[in-house]
């Protein structure tokens, strides 16, 4: 096997020092004269030299790796976010690495520590608990975007931590109001686990819409943000006499639709459905599910801008939008 060219080989061919080669490869810390830089780059190309990524990370104090830590990559919303972030960072000559905590706090802490050892350039974190245990990032030197840190909770004094703000309450209010516009009067809520901040916020939005319409609250059914959570909610929903339901995410909606179909309950004729945090998958469920969506591409761009330093706003905000399909009773064609 041919010997891999080294930095010494590049320096020898370019007629300069290994330190100067390092400055060219790492983009600093010292400037290099244009003619010298040209010789070094030509030597690198001629020899086929490939810089050691780990060594570059050590010299710069960071790598070209951006990390995403989520509790469940099976969640279509989080999977789509990972895909969009990968595309966004690839355009910026960075690589995305993804950790899945499986909704386990110990696993989450282990992954965070592994990311830190890799000297990542930045982190987007959707945590298992709320508020997030920010003490784990107390001395972090990289920018961090918190994807589900509750508004109003302490952010510490870390100048490079920001929060991506999505108005969960407003999204649930919009979903509920849309069902009311279809003449539904007994609107239930399939929420997330008890105690989760985003579950509480969605319930608040649902209650607000019902209160403003002068209607009594329907059933609130708690369960995990999974297909199994939707499956488990189905019988309670049927027994409650609801004629409509706001479902907290697309995974729950998938499980719920299957169970309603198995029980012979027609959607939307008997129970209309609107899901929160929808993705492109909602169009391919049956019936296609009306959803309140977060623009994932906009989220990914905002995260990348913050991490790369082009936007250092304290909070990054995104606005949800209602996508009308058939599960609520709207007329819908996939060709529209």
Residue ranges and their predicted role:
Residues 18-22, 59-72, 178, 186-193:
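Short beta-strand segments enriched in small/hydrophobic residues
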Residues 186-187, 217-219, 266-272:
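Short acidic capping loops at alpha-helix termini that bridge into adjacent secondary structure
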Residues 237-336:
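Flexible loop/turn connectors
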Residues 1-62:
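N-terminal helix-turn-helix DNA-binding module of bacterial transcription factors
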Residues 1-2, 65-177, 235-240:
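Alpha-helical recognition/docking segments in bacterial nutrient-uptake
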Residues 53, 71-80, 98-107, 162-174, ...:
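Hinge/beta->alpha junction and helix N-cap segments in small-molecule ligand-binding domains
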